């Protein structure tokens, strides 16, 4: 988008598709707030205390309407915020415009190039008046990776010398460009970061790997593994948003089709439920025997991708892994098979291997890959998140669960960060239960209460927590 590229070098401290969309975005933000009781009640509870006063949060998370409510909650609690999307296709342009109009710098529009994506990821760390971000709110770990990898490159350029994919080409080029301007750009910013709160499975995996290797430079909160995130956002959110994305993109009738879900974690479970609910015959591929047994006990047929490739109609990857659907799988697929991904990164499908063939764009984020024999495979969102690339992501209510956890984690880390070592932490059980409590009334749920004798009998407080940390919900 030429206008956005021009704006990124102008005096305006934001980059959005069209600021005129702000009015529409504000109307949708107002509607979303009615479905996000956790965030609204957290605002009411903490606003007078201003626990985030002095926090300068660099946010990298899908710039949707629901994220707009999160941003305005963080600001209501005292934070200054700069924001970019964590995916090139996930921004809702009217949401970005509304947040900018309200005074928050946003650098995001739907359909960014990879070069623009990494430029915008830098912009969230470029604070005015010589200040620096002191907190990161991340989804997928790209903002965290940027500072850490850039700091390493200051000392050893070889770490950005050999890109292995087009994403790394853009990232490494962006780091090189910033180092040419300021050789300590990254380390100066890294030194001010008190900690990060991470939203999703993929980013959490990166953090645990850094902790294991002794390379984690600040404390981190794993928001993803809060029960009220992973068992709600990942499961119930995907249960609604996956089929929304597929149907908006293709208008296909799901009933009667064979659908393959690769991965049967929380995300895969939600995907399988939704596809079966619309009448598909659902097959599951798994590498974990426990998850495979769960799928089989739920009535799904557990197969390999090699077996399913030439038989199924719809393929969904939900593993967080690499090349789960490869070139040979796609070559074997039926004419007009639909292929999509709902994991965070685009590496689950080997999209790069299909660039050798003719591509025909049908509409934004919907492409035909035309094989030499004339067969066509329908690829959605270029292998990136289908629910955000081809639809609008999860519903507001379930995102209120996730974002209430994010807000509480930001408060905890900003106000008590000095008490934490450079390790990965999960929010305590009483806060997980608090997040759930904040959402019960909105859906008419009435909570029973233990008597004194009952509480004593099972050895818990009447106010909770009710389960040990190792309990599996």
Swiss-Prot record:
Known EC number: 3.13.2.1
Cofactor (UniProt): NAD(+)
Gene Ontology biological process: L-homocysteine biosynthetic process; one-carbon metabolic process; S-adenosylmethionine cycle
Record GO cellular component, one term: cytosol
SUPFAM superfamilies referenced in this protein's UniProt entry, alphabetically: Formate/glycerate dehydrogenase catalytic domain-like, NAD(P)-binding Rossmann-fold domains
The UniProt record lists the keyword Cell inner membrane: no
SMART domains the record matches: AdoHcyase, AdoHcyase_NAD
Catalytic activity line of the entry: S-adenosyl-L-homocysteine + H2O = L-homocysteine + adenosine
Assigned keywords, A-Z: Cytoplasm, Hydrolase, NAD, One-carbon metabolism
Role noted for this protein: May play a key role in the regulation of the intracellular concentration of adenosylhomocysteine.
Protein name according to UniProt: Adenosylhomocysteinase
